């Protein structure tokens, strides 16, 4: 009752290409809402709009529709809005293409390389805050 609405933003990263899991290359932003069942469409639409305007690739409810946290905690009817955001590593690090070994993984963190994606994440989180405080 103290917080009539909350947003659970479950964000983590994955290699952009993982042949044993999927073909091709993942978009940089993979948004999962359990096919819209885990959060209000207004929240999802805003996040998608931010990602679409960022210049980074994105998809909603593609390969990653939302894991356990999104599916079990997202309950918009009771004010709990859950969004999974799976980030492809190439969006924030100079990810090696092809086989990985100790010479190319993990790549060093470069704040300048990561800055554009960080700004998009900041806007996504600001949208989440605006959504729960409106």
Language-model features: locations:
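Catalytic cores of processing enzymes, dominated by hydrolases/peptidases
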Residues: 1-95
